[in-house]
C-alpha cells in the first residue's frame, strides 16, 4: 500500500507485479474501495505479465474524503437528470479522471492501459476523452456512456438508510450484492459477507458515495465524445446486469470505433470468480494487441 498527493488530494494505492511490465490502472466504481478489485484478481493479472495499480477514488476508502464540499442529494440529482435539468455537482467525473492522471504522474508513468468498472468505466471513458495521450488502451467493464435508468428497486440499493449497526451494515451489503448479481454464477454468501465486513472495517463513508453518484449524473452523455476515441478498446458486460443494464455496454461499444464487445453470459453487476478467466483473457489480449501496435517497427 502507498499514498501520494495527486491533483491536490491524497490517493491510497497498491501496486502488483513488475514495473518493467506494461502498466494497468484499475479504476473502481461507485462507493467501491480499491479492494473491490480482489487481491487474487490483481495477482492473476500481474502474473500474466502486467504491472497492476489499484487505488481508492476520491471520497472513498482511505483516499481524501471531501466532506468539506457538503452533503449531496443523489436522488434529487437523479430526478433532475431524468427531467432534463442541469445537475450541480461538488466535483465531476472529469475531476476524478484528473485524479487518475495525477496518480500516474506521481508514480512516474507517462501512460497506462486503463481498466474501469461501473463508475470506474465512466471515469475511464472521461480520461481517454480528456487525456488521450495518457491511455494505451481502454477496457470498460459493465459501464455505460450515459445514465440509463434501471429498475428503481435495484437503484434503491445505493440509497438504503444506514442500519446504524455493524451487523446491519454487513447484512445490507450482502443483500445489495445479491440483488445486483446476475444469477448465472454461484453467489457465495459467506465469501461476500467476509468481503463486505472487511471493507466496512477498512472504511465506512456513505457521504462520499452520494457525492460520487451526483458526479456520475452531472457528467451527462459521453457518446458523441467517445466517437473521437482512437484506442484499442474492449467492452465487457454481463448479460444479466440489473444495475448498469446491457444496453450501456452495447452503446459503449457502438460509440468507439473498432471496439470489441464481449458478453459474459449470466453475469450481473459483479466480478464473480467464475467470470475471471474471460475477463483476464480479454484484458491480457487487448494489452498485448496494444503493445504490439505501439512497438517500434
Predicted regions and their residues:
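Conserved hydrolase catalytic core segment
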Residues: 110-149
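Hydrophobic, aromatic-rich cap/lid helix
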Residues: 198-222
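Helix-rich cap/lid subdomain of alpha/beta-hydrolase
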Residues: 144-198
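Conserved HGGG/HGGXW glycine-rich cap/lid loop of the alpha/beta-hydrolase fold
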Residues: 9-83
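Catalytic active-site module of serine/aspartate enzymes centered on a nucleophile-bearing elbow/loop
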Residues: 259-297
Amino acid at each position: 500500500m502507498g499514498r501520494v498527493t495527486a491533483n491536490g488530494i491524497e490517493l491510497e494505492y497498491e501496486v502488483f507485479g513488475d514495473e518493467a511490465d506494461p502498466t494497468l490502472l484499475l479504476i473502481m466504481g461507485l462507493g467501491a474501495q480499491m479492494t473491490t478489485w480482489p487481491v487474487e484478481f490483481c495477482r492473476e493479472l500481474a502474473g500474466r505479465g502486467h504491472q497492476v495499480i489499484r487505488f481508492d477514488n476520491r471520497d472513498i476508502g482511505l483516499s481524501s474524503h471531501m466532506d468539506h464540499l457538503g452533503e449531496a442529494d443523489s436522488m434529487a440529482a437523479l430526478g433532475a437528470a431524468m427531467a432534463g435539468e442541469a445537475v450541480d455537482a461538488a466535483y465531476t467525473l472529469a475531476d476524478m479522471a484528473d485524479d487518475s492522471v495525477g496518480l500516474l504522474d506521481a508514480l512516474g508513468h507517462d501512460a497506462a492501459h486503463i481498466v474501469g468498472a461501473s463508475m470506474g468505466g465512466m471515469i475511464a471513458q472521461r480520461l481517454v476523452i480528456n487525456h488521450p495521450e495518457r491511455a494505451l488502451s481502454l477496457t470498460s467493464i459493465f459501464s455505460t456512456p450515459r445514465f440509463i435508468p434501471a429498475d428503481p428497486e435495484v437503484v434503491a440499493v445505493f440509497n438504503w438508510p444506514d442500519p446504524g449497526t455493524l451487523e446491519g451494515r454487513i447484512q445490507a451489503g450482502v443483500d445489495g450484492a445479491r440483488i445486483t448479481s446476475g444469477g448465472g454464477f454461484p453467489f457465495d454468501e459467506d465469501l461476500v459477507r467476509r468481503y463486505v465486513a472487511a471493507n466496512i472495517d477498512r472504511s465506512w463513508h456513505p457521504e462520499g458515495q452520494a457525492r460520487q453518484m451526483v458526479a456520475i449524473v452531472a457528467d451527462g452523455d459521453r457518446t458523441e465524445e467517445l466517437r473521437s476515441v482512437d484506442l484499442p478498446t474492449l467492452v465487457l458486460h454481463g448479460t444479466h446486469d440489473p444495475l448498469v443494464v446491457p444496453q450501456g455496454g452495447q452503446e459503449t461499444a457502438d460509440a468507439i470505433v473498432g471496439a470489441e464487445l464481449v458478453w459474459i453470459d449470466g453475469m450481473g453487476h459483479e466480478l464473480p470468480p467464475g467470470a475471471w478467466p474471460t475477463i483476464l483473457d480479454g484484458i491480457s489480449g487487448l494489452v498485448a494487441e496494444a503493445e504490439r501496435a505501439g512497438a517500434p517497427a
